[in-house]
Amino acid sequence: YTISGCLLNEALQSKEEFTPEMQKEIDDWFDQQPDFLPQTDSLSQRTNVVVILCESLESWVLERKVEGKELTPHINQLLKDSTTLYAPHVLTQVKGGRSIDCQLLLNAGMLPIANGCYAVLYPNNNFYTLTKAVTEGNERNATLLTVDKEVTWNQGMVAKAFGIGTIFSKDSWVLDEKVGSRKKLGDVSFMKQSVEKIKKNVVRMSPNNNYLQFVTYSGHNPFKLPEALQQIHFKGDYPERMRDYMTMAHYTDKAIGIIVDYLKSRPDYENTLVVIT
């Protein structure tokens, strides 16, 4: 249980030999699965992609009312849209890299390694990513917006490997809403400032082949939102952690509403695919 012991154990575990038997087990599993084909009749071609990675946002708060109040009214409204594809029955597949593993899953379509973190061990890999496909190799058209430092989970190097040319990180924002134990920028202010940067063309959003990726923070454990930022309250005797999570989810939902409403106001919205996960 020492630091050196943990590192040694991780190194030993990560060098497990991949055997022909393991390959056969994988192949047999795929052979037993039904083919899933794209629903081409319900999908129209979009050349702009906006991805919103929400920290610890779980599906149980969606489409749910507590004491007559919607926990996520803005997302709920999106779910009613006939063009929305909703996949609620998805289990977490991240490993030791947590949120940075999510970026690997979504952007590169790859599962994270079982031990350790790919972002630290393999940041210089040549990844075939959604970003590169959307921007057709033009990194100027791909932007990452995060309230973290670039060194957090080695985000800076990973973004470059994924084909993201521009990063707006911690020092790019005015810290006017402090949220969480680490007092980072709250989601609502993050989205408000992001919209202003897009309007002023500080954040580049070209009409075509554009990729924007937002990474939120406020939903990070322990889900403590300052009272001044709380816009939903409950009278019932709920477990403290549950109450805190519902309050935080409502706050993050408001932030999502801000950026989505802005995107809808743009003339290129019909050409934009918005992914919230």
What are these regions (language model features)?
Residues 19-20:
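Fold-level signal for large, globular catalytic cores of enzyme and receptor domains
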Residues 24-277:
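Solvent-exposed soluble domains appended to multi-pass membrane proteins
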Residues 1-13, 77:
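Transmembrane and membrane-interface helices of multi-pass
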